[in-house]
């Protein structure tokens, strides 16, 4: 079993959306050896459910997010793969835990997009655009993890 964590600032918009989408894609592809989490680097939303905009877009696409609440990325977290939404998140993760054991990426490294950062829809209100960015990256991320961790698909 490998652990993957998506990380954004508040863990109410981008990273929980990515967690829910990734879980759905893993289910669709019948992959059971990847456990998905999400975390935030800021503590002001701890214990809160995903943002209303994230909930709406996930509901629109019939992707469950039951029981998800905001959690903080901590130095003691031990994830195999850590997937940040933007460069600021990468910097914060490295500051929180300068001795990371897991592999650290930005999500859009697994997309075909020119952008390198997933914009925060908390400020842009573009939840649909973020959904598209996350969805376009998840299968490539899954392919990478399956190969890297020598997992079975199906």
Swiss-Prot record:
InterPro entries, sorted: LMW_PTPase, Ptyr_pPase, Ptyr_pPase_sf, Tyr_phospatase_low_mol_wt
UniProt GO molecular function: protein tyrosine phosphatase activity
Source superkingdom: Bacteria
Control of this protein's activity: Inhibited by N-ethylmaleimide and sodium orthovanadate.
Keyword Phosphoprotein: yes
Enzyme category, top tier: hydrolase
Location in or out of the cell: Secreted
Functional note: Secreted tyrosine phosphatase that plays a critical role during infection as a bacterial effector protein that counteracts host defenses. Required for intramacrophage survival.
Protein name as catalogued: Low molecular weight protein-tyrosine-phosphatase PtpA
Originating organism: Staphylococcus aureus
Taxonomic placement: Bacteria, Bacillati, Bacillota, Bacilli, Bacillales
């Amino acid at each position: 079993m490998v652990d993957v964590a998506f990380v954004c600032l508040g863990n109410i918009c981008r990273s929980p959306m990515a967690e829910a989408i990734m879980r759905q894609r893993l289910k669709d592809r019948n992959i059971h050896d990847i456990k998905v989490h999400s975390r935030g680097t800021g503590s002001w939303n701890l214990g809160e459910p995903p943002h209303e905009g994230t909930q709406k877009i996930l509901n629109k696409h019939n992707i469950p997010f039951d029981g998800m609440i905001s959690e903080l990325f901590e130095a003691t977290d031990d994830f195999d793969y850590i997937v940040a939404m933007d460069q600021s998140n990468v910097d914060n993760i490295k500051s929180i835990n300068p001795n990371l054991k897991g592999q650290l990426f930005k999500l859009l490294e697994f997309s075909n997009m020119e952008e390198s950062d997933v914009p925060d829809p908390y400020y842009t209100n573009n939840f649909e655009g973020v959904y598209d960015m996350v969805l376009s990256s998840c299968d490539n991320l899954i392919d990478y993890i399956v190969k890297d961790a020598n997992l079975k698909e199906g």
